[in-house]
Amino acid sequence: MKKILALLLVAMMVISLAACNNKETPDNSQSEVQSESSQVEEPEAVVAELKSLKNKEYGVDYVSLYSKFGKETSIADVEEDPETGFAYIEKDGVKYELGLDFLSMAMVYNTDPAGSDYANADEVYVEWWKLYMQRWNALLPEIPLYSNEYYDLYNAKIKGVEEHQTNPYWTPALALIDWTSEKEDNSIIIGNTTDLSGKFRYAVFGASSPGAADNDVEKLIEGLETVATYTKDGSYIWNPTVVVEHSETENDDGSKTFTVKIAEDLVFSDGSPITAKNYVARAMAFSTPVAAQAAGKDHMALMQYVGYKAFSLYDGTNDGAEVDGVTVSKVMSGIRLIDDYTFAVTVDPEYLPYYYDIAYAGFAPTYLKVWLGDADIVDDGEGCYFTDNFYEKNGDTYVVAEQMKKSATNTDTTYPYSGAYVVKSYDNSDKSAILELNPNFKGNYEGVKPSIEKVVYKKIVSDTQLEDLQAGGIDCISGITGGDETNEAIDMADKSEGKYVYTHYSRAGYGKLGFRADFGPAQYTEVRQAIAYCMDRAKFAKDFTGGYGGVVDGPYYSGAWMYKEAVANGMELNAYATSVDSAIAVLEEGGWVYDKDGNDYVEGVRYKKIPAAEAEEKDINYQSKDGAYKTTKVGDDYYMPLAINWYGTSNNPFTDQLMTGFMENDNIKAAGFVVQNTIGEFSPMLDELYQAAVYGYYSGSPLYNAFNFATGYNSAVYDYAYNLTIDPSMYDDYSQWYIKDLADAYWLK
């Protein structure tokens, strides 16, 4: 960033000419004081180099830029490049480009308007959001392909659907609490094209994000949260059905304590009382090595709270030991049990201020045995801790970890539930679950209790879903999309003489071609950009939605308030207009200019040279699905093929359209790509994306780097903090797109 110095006044004092004749200069001939002004520029700041992270060690070679400068940076320090839309800060004469991790963190943790021209935190949030969106659009971790109108089609015997409509934040699984059923058995059958897996009690168990169908069931069987995060307008609010009193205290050390008193009449589905212990149990459990072993993933549930680091390192034997400079403690000091119905949580100053800080007080009750086995939670005045049997081991395995694994897929009434319904049964063969009314449920955040006695949640196939509805196999088809399917659904309802009704709303989300953006060619920005240039996204959206939708250029909902404000503030996004020439240009600029032998590219599939120092094992072993195109070694360097391995989901019109719109696209071939695919079920696809056996299907060898599925925004809260981290200790557990933005690295050497 150039800084112009103040004008310098240079006084040129001319001494009398007595040196020649030893005479004084007369007053009227005295030289006038002359001055001149000139602009002097500081040397332009050095722009920090963006370097590969491969084969480099976090904490030794580099750390995150946000960890270095984040807390001290305000929006007033940021300069936006008017041509690229990228954001920069200058520190000690060095100009740093701000990456996705930095921007996503600053969006929620750096909203103080002090020292800036912004009036309040909302305006600062919007500016960070705009800068984040512009960078996301440039790096393109995934390609949005359509955003559409959603149509929900119902059996007319389900009443209240028009008076209590669904919307982007209020899905049928939430809305049915206001509906009634005139069917003889007082039931509703909900269909979803996404598979159930049986992970209902904690749908995100072992994963970075939950499966959509599992998440729906979890919403039905879990409830009584202190902060309602699923509301009709998508906002976060205190839940008056649960919370009797709450307070916030800003402490001298910069931490913040939330104290929450719950109602004393809350009970689980079996009538057993719900106390403060039940609210802190799951979060505490999933901050331990016990849960990390069970889930194959460290959920770090209490990461933002005081005492987390010390508590998370406790393994049952090392209280007081020093580990990585931290004194281990069996006590979680930031979680307190004040009395049977009051708990307090203290947020670490590192995570404050926070734009959505009400979320820090959001906890939901869990029956203790589900995640603790026979262990208990105790508070002797210094904080909460588990009794010793929580950490009991059988060899190298935590006994309670095995209990947790079973609980994660428990689908009956072995343990009670806190939500509006309980799971009576689950059939893994046809992916269906039967839920029954919880008679002890106190109500949702509006105090509403459901009247429909039975909910059947089942897997449906989009090709036959309307026939299923007509045959009585389902009562609700939610999220109908695609031109043909939408037209068919509307036509069926209009001609049904009142047997079927529908509602519709604009979707908060989009269908996408997603990537494992750290693997194979998809790890390179230019490859993702080239695919976008090759595809005709506008035509794809029009063909798929039949005119009931369009396309978005980033991860946003066009109805969201921050999007509207960002557009008003001049946000500019690349629409990636179809152009094979543009695709080739970005590929050539990115180094895809070779053939497999390291010679100049002429035709066929392109290759990129990867220097040996930057080649990781996954790069060296990369190949197309059929093995015809492999990374080759020429001299000391490696050459990776421009081969995309795509996993598409079966019985999905979106997959069908991608066959022609992506895989067999003439532009794709002309640009030098080869695309190969597999069609399979949703859960195995997720395992390939995660490169982990979260659902038990992953083979152990990474292969696929492109996937088609969808993104949905079920809350008005927009927060991707930590989801774009480059810190390896958090990356696998938190990464949303598996992308490492090179601008997010601060180099130590």
Model-derived features with residue positions:
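N-terminal lobe/hinge region of extracytoplasmic solute-binding protein
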Residues: P168, P172, G191-N251
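Append "and occasionally in soluble cytosolic enzymes with long acidic Gly/Pro-rich linkers
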Residues: I237, V244, E248, K424, ...
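Aromatic- and charge-enriched surface segment that lines or borders ligand/interaction sites
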Residues: Y118-E123, K130, V244-K309, I338, ...
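Alpha-helical secondary-structure segments
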Residues: A119-L140, I189, T275-M284, D340-A344, ...
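Detector for C-terminal structural segments
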Residues: E41-L196, C534-N569, S650, D656-E664, ...
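Surface-exposed binding/hinge segments that line
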Residues: K157, A295-T397
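Gly/Pro-rich hinge or "lid" segments in bacterial periplasmic/extracellular proteins
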Residues: F205, P210-A212, E218-E222, Y230-D233, ...
